[in-house]
From Swiss-Prot:
Stated family: Belongs to the uridine kinase family.
Record pathway: Pyrimidine metabolism; CTP biosynthesis via salvage pathway; CTP from cytidine: step 1/3; Pyrimidine metabolism; UMP biosynthesis via salvage pathway; UMP from uridine: step 1/1
UniProt source species: Thermus thermophilus (strain ATCC 27634 / DSM 579 / HB8)
Binding-site list for ATP: G13, G14, T15, A16, S17, G18, K19, T20
Protein name per UniProt: Uridine kinase
Length: 211
């Protein structure tokens, strides 16, 4: 008898909306029964380009991501196969030579700004979530994160936000909200939403006999 199909949760939302915080909190709540696949680590490998060219890439456009590899890895997890997730170096703007093993699990969380964008990914999901947050709050969080954690300049972060992040959010990310089954305000600061999502996953696990 084959194992039941994993319960797949897609968590999307704008940059610094709290989607990663929510996904990680949900993964901690469910423990070893979760495989978490963050899309942030699936930026295309641009190590062959000089740093100056890598700095000019629009990392908020769908073309910046290796969506084919992300889909391949998501499908592998659903078939019960482990994957070697790439590791992205945000300071070097390219992939690290390291890989992170991700084991299959009864719950698979797909998380990232564009996980609701490709229909092929949406079709894998049992529950689609969009994390909503005020644009000003998202900008401030991103500013702090990129300057303090990723070593970027204040001027560079502001320019990138105005020229790339904001227009790409309006064009590609925000429209995917219409595909969501659940819209979560306040992202990682919303314990009620976390409890609701965890309860939904636990109920499915119980029906699968994996609780």
């Amino acid at each position: 008898m084959s194992a039941p199909k994993p319960f797949v949760i897609g968590i999307a939302g704008g940059t610094a909306s709290g989607k990663t915080t929510l996904a990680q909190a949900l993964a901690r709540t469910l423990g070893e029964r979760v495989a978490l696949l963050p899309m942030d680590h699936y930026y295309k490998d641009l190590g062959h380009l000089p740093l100056e060219e890598r700095l000019r890439v629009n990392y908020d456009h769908p073309d910046a991501f290796d969506l084919a590899l992300y889909l391949e890895h998501a499908q592998a997890l659903l078939r019960g196969l482990p994957v070697e997730m790439p590791v992205y170096d945000f300071r070097a703007y390219t992939r690290s030579p390291r890989r992170t093993p991700v084991r299959p699990a009864p719950v698979v969380i797909l998380e990232g700004i564009l996980v609701l964008y490709p229909k092929e990914l949406r079709d894998l999901m049992d529950l689609k979530v969009f994390v909503d947050a005020d644009a000003d709050e998202r900008f401030i969080r991103r500013l702090k994160r990129d300057v303090l954690e990723r070593g970027r300049s204040l001027e560079g972060v502001v320019a990138q936000y105005l020229e790339q992040v904001k227009p790409m959010h309006l064009h590609f990310v925000e429209p995917t909200k219409r595909y969501a089954d659940v819209i979560v305000p306040r992202g990682g600061q919303n314990p009620v939403a976390l409890e609701m999502l965890a309860a939904k996953a636990l109920a499915r696990l119980a029906r699968m006999g994996a609780a």
